[in-house]
């Protein structure tokens, strides 16, 4: 059985799609998932009316108390988990990782995991230049203009050791080697 650590940041963009895929993977494949949230991850899940879903689908999830609380970096670093997935990752999270700042549970998990051999997969939401469409908490389509600095940081992230940037939520099926059907 595979063990996956899944970190959720404060990104509303791609949160619903990512969440649905992770639930599908858990239900169909029996993959053990340890879910942890940044403080803003909690805020966004509540704003998108997904908080009760999380409580039902992943009842043992962990909320950030500080950069190393709850303690998850150690088990990630020593290979207790087969992969660390951060999805979706905000521009703020990506900027911190790229600049070596590990002051949240998510950025600290990435920094410490990168020192070991556990692979890290990050779904950075700001990867493409121009305007992208996303869904608001009210279910309406809205356009977001990507800032050059955020796209540039996503490109830098892709060059970092032991980190793979994934392009879309459905790529998670492929990295875990599970079927979409």
Protein language model regions, located:
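A cross-family phosphate/adenosyl-ligand binding-site feature
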Residues: 1-181
